[in-house]
From Swiss-Prot:
Domain called (+)RNA virus helicase C-terminal: residue spans: 992-1128
Protein name: RNA replication protein
Keyword tRNA processing in annotation: no
GO MF annotation terms: ATP binding; ATP hydrolysis activity; mRNA methyltransferase activity; RNA binding; RNA helicase activity; RNA-directed RNA polymerase activity
Binding-site residues for ATP, renumbered to this chain: 868-875
Record InterPro entries: (+)RNA_virus_helicase_core_dom (IPR027351), Alphavirus-like_MT_dom (IPR002588), DNA/RNA_pol_sf (IPR043502), P-loop_NTPase (IPR027417), RNA-dep_RNA_pol_alsuvir (IPR001788)
Recorded catalytic activity of this chain's protein: RNA(n) + a ribonucleoside 5'-triphosphate = RNA(n+1) + diphosphate; ATP + H2O = ADP + phosphate + H(+)
Amino acid sequence: MKLRNPKAPIRNDRKAQRSFHKMLSLKAQAKLALTIQDRLELGLLSNNFIRKKLQFVDGYCYLKFLRCAERKTAARNLGSDPSLGLMKRKLVPSQYHSWQSNYTLLVTKSSKLTFAHVNRALGGQKLAEVPANCCIGSTICPFLSVPGDHSSYLVNQLPYMNGYCYLKLIRRTCRFNAVVTLGPWPLATDFFDYIIHRNLNKDLGLFKCNLENTINGSFCHIVEADPGSQNCIFPLPQDCRIGGSISEVVKTLGPDKEMIERDAVTEIKKEIAIVRKYNPYHHSSKQQSALESYGIGSDPYAVRSHTHAAEKAIENKLLDIVGMNLRRRSVITMLWQKRNKAHLMGRSNCKDVYVNTIMEAKDLVRYDQFSFGLPSVATSTAFIGDALHHMTPESVFDLFERSPNLMVLHATIVIPPETLLKCRSSNPELYSLRYYDDKFVYIPEGHAGGSYVHEVKNSNWLAISHIQRGGKFLTVKRLETLAAHHYFVIVKGKVETDSIRVFQSPSQVELLDIFADRQSNVRCSLDHAFAIKMERYVHSLKRLELADVTAKTRQLLSSEELLQYSPTDLVKIDNYFYFLAHTSRFNSSEELIGSGFFESLVSPLKQWFSEICEKFLGKSNFHKTLEALEWKVINYDVKTVIYDMSKPWEKLHWKSENNLLSFDLDSNDNPTSLVDNTDCEASYSESTKFDYELVQVEDDFIDIRIPGIDIPIYDSEYLASEEPVEVEESPIPEVLPEIEDNLSDSMSIDGWMSQSLKTFLPEHDDKVLSILEKFGVSKYGQVVGKNLILPITDFKSVQFEKIGQDEFTESLQDRGFGFVSYTPDAERVAVAATDLEHGQGVLITSDEAGELFKKAMPMSVYTCVILGAGGAGKTTFVEKFVKDNPKSFTVVTPLSVLKKEWQRKGAKNVFTYETALKRSLKKPANEYVILDDFTRFPAGWIELYMSLNTKSKYIVIGDSRQADSHSMSGAFANALVPAIDLFAPLSPFYLNWTWRMTRPVANALGHVSWKLPESGKPILSVSSEVPKDCVVLAPSTTLKVGVETVNDKAFTYTSAQGATFDKVAILIDDNITRVCGDKAVYTALSRSKGEIVFVSTVTGPDTFEKVKCTPFLRTFVELVREYELNQPKVREPEEDFVDDVTPVTSQPKVSEEFLIEELNKNSVEKFDREIFRADLGHTDAVKEIGRVTEQIPRQQRSDEALNLVTLDKRVHHATVEENLDELARKKALGNILWTNFKEQYYSGLESVMVDQDLLVSCRAEITKTYLSKTEALLKGGQLRQSPDFDKFKIADFLKTQWVRKTEKYGLPIKAGQTVTSFMQETVMATGTLSRYMRRMFDKLCTNPNVYLHREKTEQDFSTWVKNGWNFSGHATINDCEAFDASQDGAFVEFERLHAEFLGVPRELIDFYVDTKIKSYIWRGTISVMRLSGEGPTYDFNTWANMAFMATKYSIPSVAMTAYSGDDFACDQVLSVKPAFKELECRFKLKEKRFLKSQGRGSYADFCGMIITPNGVIKNPRKLYLSLKSHDEIGTIDKAIVNYYNDLRTLISLGDNIFSALDATETEFFAGCLNVVHDYILRGSNYEGHQNLTLFKKPRTIKWRVERDETRDCLIHMIIQDRKFIRNLLEGVEQTCDNKPNSNLIFRGMTNGYQKRAKFNQLLNRQDEYLDKVLHKSAGQNALRRLTATLDDTQDSTVAEQSAV
């Protein structure tokens, strides 16, 4: 069967194709117009008439209608054939005006033609643009008579201009040619020229025009001038109306009425022909009505009879429905189906395969060909015709197990739904039912000869939704039900299906049991209407006798209905209603209406007491009546169930990895011993009884690796079994049993035991030993660690066919291989041929592909499959026969490289697969065809080649673990399953050894190898650069192209398959390699015969850590590390040491006591700071560790009290409805925020379209960021990665942290910060949204003076400040209260508008809004607010801050503004907008403004940084308390480097620091230096500091002041000087005596000390400050002696100030 791409153009009919394109080009010429009156009148007719008939009757109105808009616009909006409703919606204006008062008709003549113009009357309104040369004729003519010349014009020209004649002309001539010539809607001039051309020299004056006045207007009639004349040019109908009211046109159709009837008859004929296809039988009127209720028509003229015609019609109709669901060009396997029914399914010309197995005796005469035993299905789709009820779910599951290609099974079944409840037939005119114990009889239309007998349990098919065995599922879906006939489709896998199946239920009820004698109650069902009528009747008579009930029953039941009941049923029915008549219908309960207060209190007590009495004494008469009338309505609807066939031992799943064996446990008994067991004496045994047994039920799976590999057992549950278990235990004396040499002879082995014995004990199996001996390999495996690798694995039971014996066949059999019968899948053949026809082949043309498909004939061929590792010698023993008998062998390879390899070894007939296909057209293949490396052939190609050469025998050779082939983009073959899935089950075992790879590499891949590496040569190595001396394998085509710029010998992982190299370099990418398939990675690792070099693009000490998640590479990483550990260590040369330079500083010694007192001056006691809760007591946030640390709050998850306080304070709750109402109420505020934001940052821009490339890039960026996390973090988030984790659920917890904010230091504890964790997919989606909007904002923002502190460094911010910040006036900063909780519905609306402006896809926006509305925690749904765990938290916080500030303040265009989350800074004073005062109360967000004078100690701060003229610097106070707390806690090792980097900007200011910081801040800066200095003096053993020169001891520092080391040397110089000054102030005079020639060199020039002394003198005039700095008298004396040693060149002022 040939498949064609539906998008491919028609190839053969070139003429039709050109005409079609010409027709499309002419469509744009149409320009017609329609008046408002025309539009009004169009509404008077039905849509069906307008679409089908109007163009043949009065096409003027229809054609004019399309003219009211521009042709291109109308075509795009309406389409080529618009419906009436669509035209009215698109084109009818909202207001209508009178035609008479606004328009007039004017007829004019031109040089060529005469035109009728519709002009606007004086003073009339202009309704539409009416072209002068197009509006021919008018619906309402204002003239009572037409002048002669005008009449002549109307007679001669109008019939050909108004569209009617044009359409008639097209009907009478070739429709296609007329359309091509004129286009679908021609201009009037074009049509006139066409008419003149076709009727040259013809008399056009054979018609005349008559006018008729009616209440609806004036009409123009075209009639023949001489009715008896035979010279009519055009066969125009008499009294044809041109224009006018369409309702009148319909009434006066004239001869066209017959035309409509003829068209109706044509439609009826077509419908009858369709009905006759599946229902050619005659039926009674009741049967016809029943069939019509199921949508099955009947032929009124049918005379053919059938014993059960109606049932046969339903069966045929269901086959017609099935045929519509089957793919026409696919080959289907028909099971239990007659060939003569193929036309009912529309498959008469299809090459379907019919397989009919004998299920019952009548099948012997039903089918022309049949078989015994259910065969396998070779196609992907199969159909079972009305035989599913003969099969059990087990047999259906086995059919799928035996048929690996089978994916979809269509099946019809005949099971009446009434059998679920054993009710009588609901369709007695179609079938009747009888029940016998556990069986029922289905009698179609009362014909006993066509009856069926089934078991009642077969009705379970109606309720089965899935069939399960272990972890495998089949899904059963009901597609259609017609009476008792059902259409099911069964597919592989577990997919969603209906939880309830609804069947047509009768309007019947079952009566309640009212008598104690069960046999006296009514057991049959009654018609619901009949029961209601009887109940009303018996209660309507005052006196009722039993005879009256019997008479009424006979009156209401027809003769046919009476036959459905037995006499006993009728008697029981009469008694039921007679009993019902004598029950009371009066409610004796006390009424509530009108009762007083006292009665309303007492009445419930009375009612309660009466209910208690009824429980003991019986119900009242009224309640008896109500209970008797509680009839049960019969309903056949069923809840679907999963049919589980799993045995207890099948609960264990076996997973196959690498070369390891996988199997299911067998249900058979233990193997029977064929040799008598050795007798052993046993002592008396004691037994213990258990009442319950625990049976393990797997939760995820159990990964079994056989043999000798660890078995990771996942979480499991245990079910209790009530069967008692007796465990016996007794000692056994040492008695040595006899040991059989061959276990296969001593035991009868069934099921999986044979496989396990072959795996565990291969040395005891003669067959395995023989195979290994023939291949010349050792019978022993290799032990790697705790694992045993065997030379042969993956045993399967394969039944070989007996064929003729020759030397080659015997050689295969000696090695354990043989030929099996394989039938190529016809669908794969068709797909391969279709791909070749559409240009997927390089050497094969489309004509050759078509010829190949015609010649292909899928038939069974003999096939031998050999699977093994690369280098196992699969082709070695074949090469000898190929070389000795070249005429008997044909070798086909997927690559030219393999072809050359075969030719080098002496093979003659070797071809690539495309060449082999072309040769098959001229010459068949030889007796044996070898398909080498078959996994690289395109999918379906092997089946196509086998179908062309059916007489050859095939040897299929390959490796099941290497990569599969993938066809070009757009090929149909990409949808097919790989060939390895079809041929792997035909191989008896897997050759698990290799002679190519060295033993360490082979063992790492799970193979046995006896090739030892060469001594002194590395096997595995790691490099950061791409080598040039070997082949490089890259994980993607992009990386391959990049590698080719360095090394032209580059391949992808899979493109190198089939080739081997002495040395291979494998490029490892952190993000790409880990997502490569196992087969691709295995292919790359198995290409080398020697060394493998891993080239890593992952930087850092954790190289390869994340790649360990990839199979195979995990083992190789360990090998690489072992190899590196075994290499000799190369000792690095010691560095030369130089003398220390004299250090420089500008900071004095500061007392630590003073700094701590300054920090703690406002602190309070611990329990005065803690929060107290009555239920949980105090919080535990104050940790008494050190004097600074105890003032810093410690928030941790274990603090339950603080956790609840945080949830109460930070998280607010609401319902989803309240959140929706919040969004609706705040929508206007959101628009205001967006308007101000857009004006400030998108001035003059319009919304943009989505940038798909950027969106994909952002998604990839988010994914890469997520995968860059450590493996521990990735595994820690498994719960949120699960699809079972609700996308709106939030896992919330308290963030564990030290709160080192200066504003919270030493103050009472406040609520902590929550961390909210969404489902990972939700974070990825919203993160993509945020990243896309971030990139688009950076691209489109029109404000050059705004700075967003994201993806920027402190140096970037400092550069921005220096380039434009204005320090001449005051600056503005702000502080927001509850910033996250205040972002309500107004900000969500702002975010939605912002996203729409940037072109974000609608579904992504809707998903984000849903997360804001529906997110919930364990407490309930969260109200609309900002949450910390959202993907766009930072960006949306920043934009919310920007929008609010732009709404509240007037921000000048020249103002420099900086934003980061809720932080804000501006270099100008901002004024509040007057309009904001009215809006302020409607915003939850409250913001306070602060002004900074931008002088010393009063600069604007932003994100913990101070904005100064010299750039930005860190706040020294915050730095000191953070450093000191780290020092006290003991975590300074990890933090010292970061704080050192923060101090560098302060250090680099030099003396300028005094102009930026006040006195207190300067002292805190000196305190930071002191902490760093003391840490370095103690020395650092932290592993992260080993390579940093900063943390070496001062005397071992290598002082080379180079460009890159200047910053490091600076801090060392400061530290050394601090040490010298400290010794000096403590009175250690030896420091100066030991260095008599050394003077302190201060920063800058020699009078730097003078500057410092003068500056300190101005700031510290009080003696208290000097006492704190120089707190020892010895220190003062030492300082005076030091100043005395200054140079004599300094003046007295310097000396005096130095003394100070």
